């Protein structure tokens, strides 16, 4: 796979001309080779998403040193036994979805408080997807912020594949 500069420029232009509020592009680089990530960096992309701790470490440990303005998001499910390792490489966690995971992050509070978190909501209520159910979302966000001091900055919601997304965007 290679980085598609033309596609990126078209998306950036569309956002610039149509967005009513600031929009940040997160380039999901999972399964992409390092050469594609370097091409993306050379085009100005600085926010990347990865769904595996080991793969992200292999690609970004050196890149983040040479490009300190790079921000790395965890976009896939996180096992509690990988929390400590993930804190070394990721800046933003988009998949906070259960109390056990929150408690594991709290073991490393000095590092956790410098990170950003999104609560993952399973808006399609799909059994095979991660995330908490929509009706539990507010209570879980309050637990994270008020009870645990986790810096939650938003929600990460993905509508089900092969369905019209608009009904799910009401959440």
Segment roles from a protein language model:
Residues 1-171:
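Conserved alpha/beta-domain cores
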